[in-house]
Regions:
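Conserved donor-binding/catalytic core segment of Leloir-type glycosyltransferases
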Residues: 161-177, 183-187, 195
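Nucleotide-activated donor-binding/catalytic signature segment of Leloir-type glycosyltransferases, i.e.
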Residues: 207-229
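Short hydrophobic beta-strand element within catalytic cores of glycosyltransferases
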Residues: 263-266
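Glycosyltransferase donor-sugar binding loop
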Residues: 170, 193-208
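Short alpha-helical donor nucleotide-sugar binding micro-motif in glycosyltransferases
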Residues: 106, 225-226, 233-238
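Conserved acidic donor-binding segment of nucleotide-sugar-dependent glycosyltransferases
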Residues: 278-289, 296-302
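Aromatic "clamp/platform" in nucleotide-sugar-dependent glycosyltransferases that forms part
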Residues: 246
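Membrane-proximal helix-turn-helix segments that form the acceptor-binding/catalytic region
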Residues: 93-112
């Protein structure tokens, strides 16, 4: 299937462009360019393969129409029932229905691509009838490479003295991302600055999340959604990336932090059990007390610097590597 044109279906993409899915689509565009595979986002143009990235009804219809026309359909499985839970208001109630829906969507394709072996195992447990392969969303390590200018821009913009230690996280205002624990830690650790980048419409989130982000703490900051360039500057300008997520299919922001050579502390959850060895590329914790202790030890230089090993892990998932793997997937189809 080499050199056949790919349609990156853009339907409903506007709804997710500020999420990890939107970032994944941008990475696919970059990977296709690097692999020398022609692609379009215009559905009216001729194509042989279609990439679908969302599970909205228009994507399902597009999948079925493409199949009827003899096109190859690759469905990217970014979502699972497990990472849908504890997200938006009412998500836990409809999670079983969500699982049925995404199973139906994914089964409409010829091949399912999902970011990790962990998410692949989850999907295999759904009884999907199509082959599933794991392929990282990838990371542009060149773009996120650490540099002093980026650090200075971040510190200057938010008027942060060089002596202040800064902890950041990136994500939606949803419980699954660990935002409640992030706020608790800011409250318990007034000597450090905590910045959460990202935004979610307040009408979509439960009251407990609204109350948490409205908490008035002098060291807790919610700058909202910022550009990719500003996120990079934040990685370079901060001292710790704190990723308290309860469930992920990969976590693109984690790859970004690895590429930026920032110390990382994650929640010890199943997806990262095999992906990261504790105290080798990242530090892991399970409770508020453990997070508090590890944050202090990392920021005060009492634990080894793991950033070089973390950076090497990001290089393994560099977009150039992903491009070649995607090309080999096409050739096998």
């Amino acid at each position: 299937m080499k050199q056949n044109k790919v349609l990156l279906y853009a339907g409903s993409l506007k709804l997710v462009e500020k999420s990890g899915v939107g970032q994944a689509v941008r990475h696919q565009m970059q990977a296709l360019k690097l692999a020398g595979v022609p692609f379009t986002m215009n559905s009216k143009e001729e194509y042989s393969i279609i990439h679908l990235n969302t599970i909205f009804p228009d994507s399902l219809l597009k999948s079925k129409r493409a199949k009827r026309k003899g096109k190859k359909v690759i469905y990217y499985a970014h979502s699972t029932m497990e990472d849908f839970r504890n997200s938006f208001r009412g998500s836990n109630l409809i999670a079983p229905l969500f699982k049925k829906w995404i199973t139906y969507c994914y089964n409409s394709g010829d091949l399912i691509i999902t970011p990790t072996e962990y998410s692949k195992e989850l999907l295999e447990g759904y009884g999907l009838k199509r082959p599933i392969v794991s392929l990282s969303n990838g990371i542009d390590t060149d773009f996120f490479k650490r540099n002093e200018e980026a650090r200075r821009r971040f510190r200057d913009k938010y008027q942060i003295p060089d002596t202040d230690k800064v902890v950041i996280s990136v994500g939606h205002y949803i419980e699954r991302k660990g935002i409640l624990d992030f706020v608790k830690l800011a409250e318990r650790m007034p000597n450090y600055q905590f910045y959460w980048f990202g935004y979610t419409n307040l009408n979509l989130i439960p009251n407990m999340i609204k109350e948490a982000i409205k908490k008035q703490l002098p060291n807790l900051h919610f700058p909202g959604y910022v550009t990719r360039e500003e996120v990079r500057d934040a990685y370079c300008g901060s001292d710790l990336f704190l990723f308290l997520t309860h469930e992920e299919t990969e976590g693109i922001v984690l790859l970004e932090a690895l590429a930026a050579k920032i110390p990382i502390l994650v929640r010890d959850i199943p997806i990262y059990k095999n992906m990261f060895k504790d105290r080798e590329t990242v530090y892991k914790g399970k409770s508020i007390e453990e997070f508090e202790e590890l944050i202090t030890q990392i920021l005060e230089g009492k634990l080894p610097d793991l950033t070089e090993k973390g950076y090497n892990m990001a290089l393994e998932r560099d977009i150039k590597v992903v491009a070649q793997k995607l090309l080999s997937i096409y050739e096998q189809e």
